[in-house]
């Protein structure tokens, strides 16, 4: 599933080609996503100029002169730029054609993504309850410490809770906990303020590094320019269950936490 760095990589790839451009038409080949694509999307968006492309958590906000297209890539979706008229392959559900001769093409084999329309996107039901962005000053270790008091859940699903902080998905939660030396199974309430301060620093560092390297390529993800991400080359623990720790050589253990695979080093993390 594309996580925050992959979505931000997509935003950076498509924004320069969309902002300031006028939409000539919208072609919808299949409306059946997680929520149906609005039947009047072509009418709403065609003829409008795209003003700004933003990201909130893992949602892309394509702001037109009137209204905003909210897009989520789901489990396996991607947005990329193609030439207008390029024949569509299977699973290529939407083309947003621009007067520049380019089209923004949405592909989603599993159809778990979304394309919705809103006149007030930040107050849309999908976005209004989201926590702070991890790379802003609104998120820090003190927030983690305060929100964790009384929480008996494991620390990994705690930091993956979008009400606590957005965008810390399975890959980056696994890596950040390793970098901070915290066992993912530990109760959130049992972790000290000092360790949460360290964890927040590592979350910010790892997400920023992943964005710089274009995200992590796992199966389906490619950036908005059609290129893969390269952060996978720097993963210390994610996806390496049974292999040896790159730091101490101990065998990495893989467990299930909150229905997700989690890998950790029993020596480096406590």
UniProtKB/Swiss-Prot annotation:
Gene3D superfamilies: 1.10.8.50, MutM-like, N-terminal. A zinc finger (FPG-type) spans 236-270. Keywords: DNA damage, DNA repair, DNA-binding, Glycosidase, Hydrolase, Lyase, Metal-binding, Multifunctional enzyme, Zinc, Zinc-finger. DNA binds at residues 91, 110, 151. The active site is at residues 2-3, 58, 260. Its cofactor is Zn(2+). Coiled coil: none annotated. Binds 1 zinc ion per subunit. It catalyses: Hydrolysis of DNA containing ring-opened 7-methylguanine residues, releasing 2,6-diamino-4-hydroxy-5-(N-methyl)formamidopyrimidine; 2'-deoxyribonucleotide-(2'-deoxyribose 5'-phosphate)-2'-deoxyribonucleotide-DNA = a 3'-end 2'-deoxyribonucleotide-(2,3-dehydro-2,3-deoxyribose 5'-phosphate)-DNA + a 5'-end 5'-phospho-2'-deoxyribonucleoside-DNA + H(+). It comes from the Bacteria. InterPro entries: DNA_glyclase/AP_lyase_DNA-bd, DNA_glyclase_Znf_dom_DNA_BS, Formamido-pyr_DNA_Glyclase, FPG_cat, MutM-like_N-ter, Ribosomal_uS13-like_H2TH, Znf_DNA_glyclase/AP_lyase, Znf_FPG/IleRS. GO terms for biological process: base-excision repair. One of its GO terms (molecular function) is zinc ion binding. Its EC number is 3.2.2.23, 4.2.99.18. Monomer. Involved in base excision repair of DNA damaged by oxidation or by mutagenic agents. Acts as a DNA glycosylase that recognizes and removes damaged bases. Has a preference for oxidized purines, such as 7,8-dihydro-8-oxoguanine (8-oxoG). Has AP (apurinic/apyrimidinic) lyase activity and introduces nicks in the DNA strand. Cleaves the DNA backbone by beta-delta elimination to generate a single-strand break at the site of the removed base with both 3'- and 5'-phosphates. Belongs to the FPG family. This is Formamidopyrimidine-DNA glycosylase. The lineage of its organism: Bacteria, Pseudomonadati, Pseudomonadota, Gammaproteobacteria, Pseudomonadales.
